[in-house]
A protein has these predicted regions:
Chain A
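N-terminal membrane topogenic signal
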Residues: 1-10
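Non-transmembrane, membrane-proximal soluble domains of secreted or membrane proteins
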Residues: 2-3, 21-45, 59-61, 66-234
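Hydrophobic core of alpha-helical transmembrane segments in multi-pass integral membrane proteins
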Residues: 9-24
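Globin-like tetrapyrrole-binding proteins
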Residues: 51
């Protein structure tokens, strides 16, 4: 029996190492460009560790059982009549409960942090219309722009508006996503941490041009942002 | 007492019950597909006339409105005509009109030749096979559509189809797979197996059962017919979000109405299962002696009956907005856009369990009998189904974390969503514990059950990611979702359907499938499934949204790999089809109980007698007493002679 447990654990470790390699050798997430996405990635890794453990456990038992207890198809004996084990059943009810509640708490904390606006965030209105995005910067007069420009390090609060059908504002490197819904005002916060060029993607099927409903997003320094605003205001 | 064989009374009908007409008369005016065809046409004409007369009476302009004519004429009146024509209502109409009915007439019961499968048949075993063959036909059609748009997606940019056709293919693929394959395929397996497992001669309402089946092809044809509608097939996704769906071309109506027919089919079948399971259990078959497949279908039927009216409502509201100019979901008229999503997901989340719980039942049967061990923790397995049922109704808004719904609703919905992992985890761990120290027979159904076990864990774990609101905000509406639902619905549901079809194939057909081809089918499917869907997690997280015909060229290589793998996945079905068809025709004759399983369906011949049991079985113990010396699930002798042994 002890030999069996060692073998089972060995299989579990091998599977766990393989799955961990898959998880870390590929870069599954885009490089974060916002504080919000940094926090989301922490939750992602929490869930990943949990998943690796659970998958390895189940896969190891399946592989071990088939390897150890497979019999020829014409074998006609029965296995031992084990109907259950209350202790085990309590354990595999309680442990997952603790794990998912822990994940729930971590998620709720991150959600609340990602939703808490600072005193004066940069106000940006994102307007979705088949099949283009428009951005308005209410703090700087009434100009609008087809490209999204944000200053690095400053929190921006997006207010979404949809002209016709539902669209969804998404920049993969920002990690944040929110639908723009006709008749409903929705908001989302983004605090860019690095400069660069990104794509605003519409993530909600909105019609024939949905796949091409994209806009350019640029995160620039505060000085460049001020310069850009001046040009736009002129 | 010995139950008399109901069929034996067949010959005793008085002569005046014999059909008085010539065979030509019967062909056109007797129940059947010919009468179904002309009565469908007549229904269409009548419905169209009704619309035109009413519209001109009220002097509405224009008198001819194609959408209204199609809804009333083609999608309500014609199907009703078809159902009347094939004879689905004959018995009830005879009864209502006071004409003689023949409650003991079993001429429409059971199959004596292949033609009996093409008419209204009240035998649950025939209906089960009707369901399975029909649903597999739609599985092939839906699969071909998937391969078609995977060909389009093999490279960025548009190559083969235009944008509306692409959206149509994606939408109809999902709709067929959900409403015409997974849900009814499970209904088909359960139709065949559940009455047998209960020790019942048939379902509680055999005529309703026949009607439930014939509603299904109507829905399927409606979804497919949307491709010939002006403007193309419905292209708002299977979710058909308003207000986008309300501005779609005519094809959208085919979705709105098709869902009604498929939904009616599900609801009627579910009611039938509930009444059958509650009232038709053999003596001694207490709830705690029912096989887990029966438990699973009991739970699923509760879900169907409670939830399905919500999708019917959501689609009627969209239809009303489209043709009656109401404003349920149009903000200009005071409608609430998110209302659609709340009502839709109040069905469509439980629908995920409707598409999974019957599979849980199948896997419990297969793993237990192929490991030669009792199901580990039988009662907790049944209770966890109930736990999923209850929790399943409290999680719908997790599909709406980025939809702009009330912020305060997100954390409670996240908690309930994550809690579902507990009963699901119990089931997964109990199956693995059932394997422990078993004597494992690695047959094809067992391979699919084990494939399910591992793939479903991946789908469940990606569900944990999506249950967490912050991760969902990043991953929602991307290919990560596509990967997740295919791990749940293909690696989960479809694998269990294959397991079930292989497992009960000898019982259904009386012949054995080819084990070698079955194994080829499994491994081809298993490998190509993973190569197809696993990389989708990656492209989704990296920034590829779902439902797009064009995408960032950075994802080109991976999408090419995915497309090639999807073709292999499609081709693997050929192995299954060849195996099933040739084995059905000339496979080796199967024994009554090739798996030496204990549940009741294996205690009768393969295929079972026309009324299942020549004598009513007396159930004396649990269904999974493998390895218990002298244990029996049932004794097939008259009830009063049976001795009770503790379960």
């Amino acid at each position: 029996m002890r030999k069996g447990i060692v073998q089972l654990v060995a299989i579990g470790v091998v599977i766990g190492v393989l799955v961990t390699l898959v998880a870390v050798l590929f870069q599954w997430l885009p490089t974060s460009a916002t504080e919000e996405f940094d926090r989301i990635q922490d939750v992602y890794w929490f869930a990943t560790v949990m998943s690796i453990v659970i998958f390895s456990l189940v896969a190891a038992v399946v592989v071990y059982a088939v390897w150890k207890w497979r019999v020829p198809l014409d074998d006609d004996a029965d296995g031992p009549p084990i109907h259950g084990h209350t202790g085990l059943e309590v354990v595999w009810t309680a442990v997952p409960a603790i794990l998912v509640i822990a994940l729930g708490i971590v998620s709720a904390v991150v959600l609340s942090e990602n939703g808490r606006a600072s005193d004066r965030p940069l106000q940006v209105k994102a307007i979705g219309q088949q099949f283009a995005w428009k951005f308005e910067y209410g703090d700087y007069g009434d100009f609008e722009s087809g490209e999204l420009v944000l200053p690095v390090g400053r929190e921006a609060q997006f207010t979404m508006e949809a002209v016709d059908v539902i669209h969804s504002f998404w920049v993969p490197q920002f990690g944040q996503k929110m639908d723009a819904v006709p008749g409903v005002e929705t908001t989302i916060l983004v605090t860019p941490t690095r400069t660069g060029e990104f794509a605003v993607i519409c993530a909600e099927l909105c019609g024939l041009g949905h796949a091409t409903m994209r806009a350019k997003a640029r995160v620039v320094t505060q000085a460049d942002f001020d310069k850009w605003v001046k040009e736009k205001q002129a | 007492m010995t139950a008399t064989h109901p069929d034996s009374s067949h010959a005793q009908y008085p002569p005046h019950f014999e059909p008085p007409h010539s065979s030509t008369w019967r062909l056109f005016f007797g129940p059947g597909l010919v009468r179904g065809a002309w009565m469908a046409a007549a229904g269409f004409v009548l419905g169209t006339l009704l619309v035109l007369v009413l519209r001109s009476w009220w002097s509405w302009d224009p008198v001819w409105n194609t959408e209204v004519v199609l809804v009333v004429g083609a999608m309500v009146a014609a199907p009703m005509g078809f159902l009347g024509g094939i004879g689905a209502f004959d018995y009830w109409l005879y009864y209502i009109s006071g004409r003689p009915t023949r409650p003991e007439d079993h001429s429409g019961h059971g199959a004596r030749g292949w033609r009996d499968y093409f008419r209204v048949n009240t035998d649950h075993k025939v209906i089960g096979i009707q369901y399975l063959v029909t649903t597999f036909v739609f599985f092939v059609i839906g699969g071909l559509m998937a391969m078609f748009f995977r060909a389009e997606l093999a490279q960025p940019g548009l190559q083969f189809v235009d944008s509306q056709t692409f959206n149509g293919l994606v939408s109809v693929h999902a709709t067929l797979m959900i409403f015409l394959f997974i849900i009814p395929a499970f209904a088909g397996i359960a139709n065949f197996v559940v009455p047998l497992m209960l020790g019942a001669p048939d379902m509680a309402f055999p005529r309703l059962n026949a009607l439930s089946f014939w509603l299904l092809p109507i829905a399927g044809i409606m979804f497919l017919a949307s491709f010939i509608a002006p403007g193309g097939a419905f292209g708002a996704g299977w979710t058909g979000y308003a207000p986008f769906a309300e501005g779609q071309p005519l094809g959208q109506t085919f979705f709105n109405m098709g869902v009604q027919w498929a939904g009616a089919s599900s609801i009627l079948t579910a009611l039938n299962f509930l009444v059958t399971i509650i009232t038709m259990r053999a003596p001694g078959m207490t709830f705690w002696r029912m096989p887990l497949l029966v438990w699973a279908n009991f739970t699923t039927s509760l879900l169907v009956v409670i939830a399905t009216p919500f999708i019917a409502g959501s689609q009627f509201f969209v239809l009303f907005d489209r043709i009656l100019h109401t404003s349920f979901f149009t903000p200009e008229g005071g409608g609430y856009v998110l209302g659609y999503q709340h009502v839709f997901w109040f069905y469509s989340h439980p629908a995920v369990y409707i598409m999974m719980l019957p599979g849980f039942g199948i896997v419990s049967e297969v793993i237990s009998s192929m490991s030669r061990k009792p199901v580990f923790g039988y009662r907790l397995m049944a209770l966890s189904l109930m736990g999923i049922l209850v929790l399943g109704f409290s999680v719908w808004a997790h599909h709406m974390f980025v939809a702009g719904m009330a912020d305060w609703l997100r954390v409670p919905m996240m908690i309930t969503t994550l809690l579902i992992a507990i009963p699901t985890g119990i089931k997964v761990f109990s199956w693995t514990a059932t394997l422990w120290q078993g004597r494992i027979h690695l047959t094809t159904p067992m391979l699919f059950a084990l494939g399910f076990l591992t793939m479903f864990v991946i789908g469940g774990l990606s569900g944990i990611y999506l249950g967490s609101v912050p991760i969902d905000i990043a991953a929602s509406d991307t290919y990560f979702i596509v990967a997740h639902i295919h791990y749940v619905l293909f690696g989960g549901s479809v694998f269990t359907i294959f397991a079930g079809v292989y497992y009960w194939f000898p019982k259904m057909t009386g012949r054995m499938y080819d084990e070698r081809l079955g194994k080829w089918h499994f491994w081809l499917t298993f490998v190509s499934f993973n190569v197809t869907f696993f990389p989708m997690h990656y492209v989704g997280l990296r920034g590829m949204p779902r439902r797009v015909f064009d995408y960032d060229s950075a994802f080109g290589d991976l999408n090419f790999v995915i497309s090639i793998a999807s073709f292999v996945l499609g081709a693997s079905f050929i192995v299954f089809a060849y195996n099933v068809i040739t084995s059905w025709v000339r496979g080796p004759v199967a024994e009554a109980n090739p798996w030496r399983a204990h549940s009741l369906e294996w205690q009768v011949s393969s295929p079972p007698p026309i009324f299942n049991f020549d004598e009513i079985p007396q159930v004396v113990g649990g269904p999974y007493e493998y390895g218990v010396p002298g244990a029996r699930h049932a004794v097939m002798s008259p009830a009063r002679e049976a001795k009770e042994v503790p379960a």
